UniProtKB/Swiss-Prot annotation:
Family membership: Belongs to the MurCDEF family.
Record has Cell wall biogenesis/degradation as a keyword: yes
Name this protein carries in UniProt: UDP-N-acetylmuramoylalanine--D-glutamate ligase
Keywords of this entry: ATP-binding, Cell cycle, Cell division, Cell shape, Cell wall biogenesis/degradation, Cytoplasm, Ligase, Nucleotide-binding, Peptidoglycan synthesis
Organism: Synechococcus sp. (strain JA-3-3Ab)
């Protein structure tokens, strides 16, 4: 009797190694085939784990448990068949749970802002001299942390886990643990429609997010989000944060951060490094979680000073000076839905040349489209969604757009457009931003938003290099 792992992403790879380290019989299956997957296949097969690539999923004889990577739908036909046969089906995060349940957790979920909030919390623990491992949907998979903890290679004080709706959907036992078990603190960053093609309804999507807070001892919610502001009274022991309301547990007054009425830090430098009100919201959420975990204000202050931002989230990757005009290239590949695309545009000053598109998600693009109309000088569209996005823009009478075949071409065309725009500026010293903020998933052309962001960075740096020759 063995264990079958579906998906050979980093989570599936780690889950297989955790099972094998316990002496269990493991098979891994992935319907895709690529050079990266073959490298992982070779690594696992050296550890005695058979791997099947490039074949449709099928249940193997003698399997007693199927472990599901986050990218595989929880209602996949193979999983439905496994359940009919009485085979246990668990998510990768749940597999890690028995090895980590003795530790306190900060669990962080939400539509947008999860990763930055998670990284900020981990930084606050680090400055306080505690190892709070950022993991889950960011950094290390939970099963990798579980393996290293079980083997004695790590002794973390806390787990700081970003948990996606996919992971929460597949972690029912984790979320039904006895009262008082981790997560000690549950954080809900934002809530807007996303992943409806997988979860079906907004109510189901919200339900998976709410699981985390229902099990937590303490909860932190974003009072700037209307849905979460309404729900803040649904649970006891709930902190809420606000950019302006002094009744909140954590709030801003001017540029000063207050926690429980006490001034903690000035945020001018942070706002310069991490632009946008959404990043201030992320910081307030992280500060609230750290405070509840007993992190002193001095460590929170130190983390605010040292935090440099996150890759693929309004990350400035290059700058080219054209006369007096700086042209800045900003990588916001993590913007995989319309809300995140709106947040990026709202955080930046015009003029902006926007590169958008990819694989469209369900959702209402109207607010994003209106902000494009108000702030964006030109839109360059790529990927599967390009024709539909072009039509939506034309319907609001926005016509300064172009559909292009690849990101490489879009970066080159964006630079040409920026150079032309620079000549027409009233203030030649005014920066122009070339922004990759797709508002779409990456899977039509890339393996992940990180893959897309790395490619954008490489294109920009190659452009800079060609101009220096």
């Amino acid at each position: 009797m063995g264990h079958q792992v579906l998906g050979l992403g980093i989570a599936g790879w780690s889950a297989a190694r955790l099972l094998r380290a316990q002496g269990k019989e493991v098979w891994v299956w992935d319907e895709q085939d690529s050079e990266l997957l073959r490298q992982r296949q070779a690594e696992l097969e050296r550890e005695g784990i058979p791997v099947h690539l490039g074949q449709p999923f099928q249940l193997l004889p003698g399997v007693k448990q199927v472990v599901v990577s986050p990218g595989i739908a929880w209602d996949h036909p193979l999983l439905q068949e496994a359940r009919r046969q009485g085979i246990e089906v668990v998510g990768e995060a749940e597999l890690a749970w028995p090895f980590l349940e003795h530790l306190p957790w900060v669990g962080i979920t939400g539509t947008n802002g999860k990763s930055t909030t998670t990284a900020l919390v981990a930084e606050m623990f680090k400055v306080a001299g505690l190892e709070g491992i950022p993991c889950g949907n960011i950094g290390l998979p939970l099963s990798q942390v579980a393996l290293e903890t079980w083997q004695g290679r790590r002794q973390p004080a806390w787990i700081v886990a970003e948990l996606s709706s996919y992971q929460l959907e597949a972690s029912r036992h984790l979320m039904q643990s006895s009262p008082g078990s981790p997560p000690r603190i549950g954080v809900w960053t934002t809530f807007t429609p996303d992943h409806l093609e997988r979860h079906g309804t907004l109510e189901r999507y919200a339900g998976f997010k709410a699981r985390l807070l229902q099990r937590a001892q303490w909860r932190v919610v974003n009072g700037e989000d209307p849905y979460l502001f309404r729900r803040r009274q649904d649970w006891e022991n709930t902190y809420w944060v606000s950019l302006q309301d002094p009744q909140a547990d954590v709030f801003l007054r001017g540029s000063t951060l207050y926690i429980q009425g006490e001034a903690v830090a000035e945020l001018e430098d942070f706002a310069e490094r991490c632009p946008g009100s959404h990043n201030l919201q992320n910081l307030l959420l992280a500060a609230a979680a750290a405070h509840l975990a007993g992190i002193p204000n001095t460590a929170i202050q130190g983390a605010i000073r040292s935090f440099a931002g996150m890759p693929h989230r309004l990350e400035r990757v290059a700058q080219i000076q054209v006369g007096s005009t700086p042209i800045r290239f900003v990588n916001d590949s993590k913007a995989t839905n319309y809300e995140a695309g709106w947040v990026a545009l709202n955080a930046l000053s015009p003029p902006i040349i926007l590169i958008a598109g990819g694989r469209a998600k369900q959702g209402d693009p109207s607010a994003w489209l209106r902000l494009i109309q108000a702030k964006v000088a030109r839109v360059l569209l790529i990927g599967e969604a390009a024709p539909a996005l072009a039509q939506a823009l034309q319907e609001i009478r926005y016509t300064d757009l172009e559909i292009l075949p690849t990101l490489d071409v879009a970066v080159e065309r964006a630079f040409v457009a920026a150079c032309s725009l620079a000549q027409a500026l009233d203030n030649p010293a005014q920066p122009i931003t070339v922004l990759l903020s797709p508002a779409c998933a990456s899977f039509d052309q890339y393996s992940s938003f990180e893959h897309r962001g790395h490619h954008f960075r490489a294109c920009c740096q190659a452009l800079v290099g060609s101009l220096e020759c």
